[in-house]
């Protein structure tokens, strides 16, 4: 057995890092609560309410460009210089500053300040993700790096599943935006608490044993160093894949509620569990893909491929049951999950094969959702989350 394959996952550092993954999901999904409320209170057009998501996600591109320019100017990778752990903490600090903008945004009922605050929060997330993703991959056997990312992504989707519920309860005293009685000013307290949490986690990470630098693993294989990005098709094709995946994920989440309202005459309080299941679907898929992290034994992995996804589905059921949502039409989704489990088993942990299978199933799900009706179309569109998950 090679030295690399003998490396064990650093679970202590991994658990600490997953806290920031949780925050990414918590805030991103909570935007779906802000969108309909600000649309109503500020009399926004549909395209303006969509700007809430746009302002949050576009800064990942902006942040990457800023990072690239700064690294080029310094002639050295910034995170290699300051450290990955420190980079995550700085990113959390930037996000905390963004939450402060929600105070004047609420008091002045300013749409511009609202999206500015979200932009700054997302800018901090951009730096956090730049540092955290490669750090997670480095915490053990490189061959299981993608599985550790899936596990961390599963924690991210715990945040996406419970975030909207907690934010709605904190702002409105209810889980349904349709029943909101509070004014826009009520966003101040929960986002101040969120900002404080960012700072607390930044401090905890700085004091933790999370490595500040990534140790390069020695390899006996001959390395063919290439000078141009064009020489690394897995890099630029991967960038295209991420662009498409994020576009599908965000567009589906942002418009699913409107689709159910227009085509099925659902009230906003009826829509809540469907949107929640969409986000939970990403958690279900990522937990399934992380089975290899827990054991290298094929039998154990096969068992976990069933236990983990249905455990994640159980979290969705628990959260929505506590908030008195009607889940009766959604229980049959357990059979849809079987398609994802089969695809994961067929991928055999190979990232390229997994990408091909999940992309194909995602396309099929979208086509079924477009050309069918009734619960079949709803299940198909929600299942897009399953196939965007890894």
Language-model features, listed with the residues they occupy:
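Central cavity-lining transmembrane alpha-helices of secondary-active solute carriers
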Residues: 50-76, 276-289
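C-terminal membrane-cytosol helix-exit motif in multi-pass small-molecule transporters
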Residues: 163, 167-176, 192-219, 318, ...
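Hydrophobic core of transmembrane alpha-helices in multi-pass small-molecule transporters
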Residues: 22, 98, 110-128, 243-244, ...
């Amino acid at each position: 057995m090679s030295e690399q394959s003998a490396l064990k996952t650093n679970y202590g550092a991994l658990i600490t890092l997953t806290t920031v993954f949780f925050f990414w999901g918590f805030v991103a999904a909570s935007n779906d609560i802000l969108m309909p409320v600000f649309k109503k209170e500020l009399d926004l057009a549909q395209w303006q309410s969509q700007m809430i998501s746009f302002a949050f996600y576009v800064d990942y591109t902006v942040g990457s460009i800023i990072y690239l320019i700064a690294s080029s100017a310094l002639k050295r990778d910034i995170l290699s210089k300051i450290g990955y752990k420190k980079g995550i903490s700085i990113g959390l600090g930037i996000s905390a500053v963004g939450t402060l903008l929600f105070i004047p945004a609420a008091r002045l009922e300013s749409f511009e300040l609202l999206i500015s605050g979200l932009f700054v929060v997302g800018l901090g997330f951009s730096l956090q993700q730049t540092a955290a993703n490669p750090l997670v991959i480095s915490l053990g056997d490189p061959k299981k790096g993608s599985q550790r990312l899936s596990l961390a992504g599963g924690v991210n989707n715990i945040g996406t599943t419970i975030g909207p519920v907690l934010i709605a309860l904190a702002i409105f005293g209810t889980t349904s935006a349709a029943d909101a009685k509070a004014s826009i000013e009520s966003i101040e307290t929960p986002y101040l608490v969120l900002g404080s949490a960012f700072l607390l986690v930044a401090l905890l990470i700085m004091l933790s044993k999370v490595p500040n630098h990534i140790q390069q693993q020695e390899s006996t294989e001959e390395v063919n160093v290439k000078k141009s990005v064009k020489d690394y098709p897995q890099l630029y094709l991967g960038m295209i894949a991420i662009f498409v995946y994020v576009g599908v994920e965000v567009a589906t989440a942002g418009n699913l509620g409107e689709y159910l309202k227009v085509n099925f005459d659902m009230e906003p309080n009826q829509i809540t569990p469907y949107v929640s299941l969409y986000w939970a679907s990403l958690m279900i898929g990522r937990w399934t893909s992380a089975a290899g992290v827990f054991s290298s034994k094929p039998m154990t992995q096969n068992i976990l491929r069933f236990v983990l996804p249905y455990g994640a589905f159980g979290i969705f059921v628990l959260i929505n049951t506590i908030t008195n949502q009607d889940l009766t039409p959604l229980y049959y989704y357990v059979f849809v999950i079987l398609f994802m489990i089969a695809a994961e088993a067929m991928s055999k942990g190979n990232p390229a094969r997994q990408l091909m299978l999940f992309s194909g199933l995602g396309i099929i799900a979208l086509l079924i959702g477009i050309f069918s009706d009734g619960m079949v179309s709803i299940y198909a569109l929600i299942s897009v989350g399953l196939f965007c998950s890894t």
